[in-house]
């Protein structure tokens, strides 16, 4: 079950697939929210809570058993954002892919910044519209065995298109071969660069990097200040892409997301708009 619910003026996602609660938006009464989330986790036997909080709330979360796994500078107008996690099972704290993730990061450290990008002229990039929702959902279902949000559901894609998400697609002769999205925090003018999915036979052609370049350009033109991503820690391609585009690594969330059939660690990368 994947359920997004509002508690007073806070929003949380309760996810059986991810075996966690994701605090998506903090309301005013944070103390009561923390108690409520603890209660739900114990009742449903969920093993992790994950939240993005402002610096002035960080200490309150730490006092309630949360640890900081990552950071985004200047996310708020006069404060940073912190990714805070609380574990309800010891096994959830232990990474299954720590060696692979370490190898990826060590390699990525050797990669220089190189934002130059282009793709073959046969490809066509566009911002997706509502008529693309069905084939976009099918594209995502081809690429991901499991995913933390139901992007294989055209109704979910339609709903998010109508609120705060722009989807980008690259087509080859009318067929979607790569996709991504900008999940916009309209109030704070920050944006998550996410949902990158390239068909296997079209990988290593620079499509993700080109998508990111276009996404950044459009978001910057619309006044967005901070760009960030939460990338699979064992993916050489995505971590290299963000490093080449000038993003800074700022932490890792352990066993955070059920993606491609496993719980995986996720790396945080961010970049401030120039």
Curated annotation (Swiss-Prot):
InterPro entries listed in its UniProt record: Acyl_CoA_acyltransferase (IPR016181), GNAT_AblB (IPR022525), GNAT_dom (IPR000182)
Catalysed transformations (reactions): (3S)-3,6-diaminohexanoate + acetyl-CoA = (3S)-6-acetamido-3-aminohexanoate + CoA + H(+)
Domain N-acetyltransferase: 123-274
Any one GO molecular function term: N-acetyltransferase activity
Enzyme's top EC category: transferase
Keyword Manganese: no
Pfam families: Acetyltransf_1
PROSITE patterns xrefs: GNAT
Keywords (A to Z) from UniProt: Acyltransferase, Transferase
EC numbers: 2.3.1.264
Disruption outcome: Cells lacking both ablA and ablB no longer produce N6-acetyl-beta-lysine and are incapable of growth at high salt concentrations.
Function: Catalyzes the acetylation of beta-lysine to N6-acetyl-beta-lysine, a compatible solute produced by methanogenic archaea that helps cells to cope with salt stress.
Family statement: Belongs to the acetyltransferase family.
Protein's name in the database: Beta-lysine N(6)-acetyltransferase
Organism annotation: Methanococcus maripaludis (strain DSM 14266 / JCM 13030 / NBRC 101832 / S2 / LL)
